[in-house]
Every structure is written in structure tokens, then in C-alpha cells.
């Protein structure tokens, strides 16, 4: 049985962490996020190719971010079901719902509201506020569908680790 209060809290915090990391990445490593924008916005941003040092910092940032996000997902799932038997399906559903919650926040709040509708400078590539692609809702919906697949795969991997850890701690 899912621990709904813990799941809701995990979804909110995880989505806020993702939003923070996306904003930081866009400010400090925009070339790492350019593929998440329509082609005309990528062209208008005219981002220079990253130097080897910038690539290294981007890789370190991404590794740290994913380590934090995945550790948070595993830890909150372990805490949500501590002291009670939880099946693999329960672990997977908890993690999958966390992933889908972020994916929905990414589409509805970040992409459609902050980028497409409001044009928030915090989430736009440099020099792209004027681009027609800024209002390309379809582009972001396709990204959402890809995110559903990616989050399903990631959730399965995290569920294997989490479920294994649960059984080792018994």
C-alpha cells in the first residue's frame, strides 16, 4: 500500500529540487540544456561551444545533481516504508509517481507556463525571448512524452536499488 502523505511530500520536494537544478544549469551551463528548446531558440541563443574546462564542470555538475536527486528518491522511499513490508511494486509505484509528478511539473509549470506563456528570463536561453519557438507548446509536449519513457526507466532502476536495500536492511 502506498504511503500517500509521504509520496506527496516527496513529489513536491523532488520537483522543487529539479526546478532549482534546471535554473542553475540554464544560468551556468546553458549549452547542456539547449536541446530542450525548439530549434529556432537554439539558433537565436547562438551559444558558443563549451571549452574542455566547461565540459568538465558541466559533467561534474550533472553527476552531483543526479547523485543528489537519485539519493533523495531512494532515501524518501526507504523512509516512507520503513518498518513495514513493501513490495517491489510499491517501491516502483512510489518512485514512478515521483518521476511523473516532476515530469508534469516540468511540462505544465516550467515549459508551458514559465517558458511558453510568461517567457520567464530565469528559464529562457539568452537572446530567445523574441523567438516563435518560445510558444511551441507541441515541442514541449513531445518532450513530456519522452520524459514519461525516461522516468519510467529511471524509476525501474531506482526501484531495483531501493527494493534490494529494503531487503538487505531486514
Regions found by a protein language model. Give the residues of each.
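Juxtamembrane/disordered regions of integral membrane proteins
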Residues: 1-97, 101-170
Amino acid at each position: 500500500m502506498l504511503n500517500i502523505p509521504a509520496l506527496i511530500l516527496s513529489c513536491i520536494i523532488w520537483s522543487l529540487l529539479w526546478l532549482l537544478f534546471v535554473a542553475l544549469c540554464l544560468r551556468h551551463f546553458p549549452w547542456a540544456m539547449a536541446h530542450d528548446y525548439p530549434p529556432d531558440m537554439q539558433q537565436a541563443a547562438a551559444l558558443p561551444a563549451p571549452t574542455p574546462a566547461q565540459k568538465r564542470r558541466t559533467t561534474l555538475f550533472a553527476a552531483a545533481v543526479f547523485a543528489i536527486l537519485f539519493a533523495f528518491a531512494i532515501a524518501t522511499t526507504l523512509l516512507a516504508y520503513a518498518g513495514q513490508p513493501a513490495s517491489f511494486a510499491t517501491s516502483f509505484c512510489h518512485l514512478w509517481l515521483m518521476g511523473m509528478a516532476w515530469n508534469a511539473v516540468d511540462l505544465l509549470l516550467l515549459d508551458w507556463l514559465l517558458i511558453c506563456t510568461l517567457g520567464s528570463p530565469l528559464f529562457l536561453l539568452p537572446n530567445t525571448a523574441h523567438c516563435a519557438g518560445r510558444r511551441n507548446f507541441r515541442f514541449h509536449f513531445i518532450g513530456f512524452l519522452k520524459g514519461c519513457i525516461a522516468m519510467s526507466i529511471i524509476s525501474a532502476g531506482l526501484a531495483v536499488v531501493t527494493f534490494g536495500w529494503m531487503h538487505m536492511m531486514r
